[in-house]
């Protein structure tokens, strides 16, 4: 039995999230259907992180166990032949039994691309979030500072969250303006359900001047979801990368898959 890891990219707007559902319109369902068509046997995948409806994947990772002997490029090309244009396997790699797509990961990174312009752009539909009013980047950065570290993030989890604990370690929040865009990067050991979108909602509320920067600290320590801002739209959210120990030599996601992914290539 061989353990195979795959790097997956997908357009989340085309699916009802990652996790398999009875109607079959999820990324997992499409991937496992394609693997079954190629391998001529059912293969069950384990994913690094389940994404919600509308959330995109740039650096998603899965693994599965198989008795089949196939070359790495064969897993890539063969599986892609049965996938829709909205999903693609980027790489395949045999892994030791100790590797686990979810439990071996020590960090996850998400990007959010926000288009700031008086008029929305149809060309960016589902690819970037949109807001029509200018945002105070310095105020958002000041507010974000209180979130760094290990905290109880109950105020930013959804009612459907199945995580055993609301305590997560947020390593980094970067906010970079670029033309008509503001780019956000969130890096943590793990994220709660809707956590990034709820953080985005609060940061945007501060950026619009609805609340002072200190308000976000009050929300964090209040641990009450009702005190936070509404959940922000999923359109501009990307699972950018999953971090693993170097011993596994997991390939890095393909840079430049979307124009704004290169914003972070220098850091």
UniProtKB/Swiss-Prot annotation:
The keyword Chloroplast does not apply. GO terms for molecular function: RNA binding; tRNA pseudouridine(38-40) synthase activity. Belongs to the tRNA pseudouridine synthase TruA family. GO terms for biological process: tRNA pseudouridine synthesis. Substrate binds at residue 110. Its EC number is 5.4.99.12. The gene is truA. Keywords: Isomerase, tRNA processing. It is an enzyme of class 5 (isomerase). The active site is at 52 (nucleophile). SUPFAM superfamilies: Pseudouridine synthase. It catalyses: uridine(38/39/40) in tRNA = pseudouridine(38/39/40) in tRNA. Homodimer. InterPro entries: PsdUridine_synth_cat_dom_sf, PsdUridine_synth_TruA, PsdUridine_synth_TruA_a/b_dom, PsdUridine_synth_TruA_C, TruA/RsuA/RluB/E/F_N. Formation of pseudouridine at positions 38, 39 and 40 in the anticodon stem and loop of transfer RNAs. This is tRNA pseudouridine synthase A.
